[in-house]
Amino acid sequence: MSFKHSVRDSWLAASYAVGVSELYKKLWGRKRGIISYHNVLPLSKLPHFDTYNVDQTVEVFEKQIQFLQKHFRILPIQELGNPKAEGFFITVDDGMANNYSLLAPILDKYDISALFAVCPALVNGQYPHIWRDHLFLLLRQYQHQPIWLPFNHYREPLQVGINGETLNKLTRKLKKNVYEQQVADIYGLLKEICQKNEWSYELSDDEPLRYQFMNWSQIQDLHRRGHSIASHTMTHRVLKFLPDHEKQYELIESKKHLENQLGTSVDTIVYPYGSLAEIDESTIAIAQEAGYQLGLMNIQTHSLSHPMLALPRFAFPPIDTPAHLHAIASGYKFLFR
């Protein structure tokens, strides 16, 4: 941790202890917020290969929920479309198996309803993993041999270390390359990497809770229990890189699939990744044409034309310290960037 962050964290802890952050919350704090989660895992400590920092332990997740209920107000997810509703909403992205077996029971324990965003094509098995997870799993499985990657048009192999941090850095580097090249067919790129390295595209899955998806019966059961289901597109590709007809497939077909499976209307789209690097005005226009009423991002932006289709969210890191959770939820922390 840098000296700057150490000083900031000490100040946040002191502010919480003497009530300064609580005063900020009452006078100027965030009155409404949408919180994003992804995975909740049955571990005492998260592994260092959480490449995208989207995982929580069961224990920490439950403590975060307890904290929110004590200090803030968690609203029923059915109120999400009401702009006057003040409080916090819980959303969960990707539809992984742990969402059903571990995360949802904690929500049920505290009588909380949430929004689960799923990708129908991934539930149906069109692809075995979200591309970013598949990429990491491939690198992890074959890390002890030279690896050919598209950075230099496969001209020279890379020797990857056995350290998980090295794998994380390489995975992020590949993701950066995808963004720089604006790769639309990301799953095709994964198959190309496998062909160049003579790897099997299919992987043995020893972590089903983390890398496998819920099935339709589980998703339908969540809906019956009072949770809401949203589209997370069909395949979790980067929407901004796609031509309009592919965006239409991702947004319109996912909505149709979900409505057929659930027997009800689906009016919320949760954009994968959720920043302006992945979402453009064309995406918003197609979402509106598809009939979505709400669109969730991961940032605050005023540059897109339809505010209700570009609602901001925030996330908690995997911590349970009250001072930091309070500072993030209230917005107090962001005074000290």
Residue ranges with predicted function:
Residues 63, 98, 102, 214-217:
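Short, well-structured alpha-helical interface segments that form or flank functional binding sites
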Residues 84, 96, 105-117, 169-201, ...:
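CE4/NodB-like, metal-dependent polysaccharide N-deacetylase domain
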Residues 91-134:
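Long, hydrophobic, well-ordered secondary-structure blocks that form the structural core
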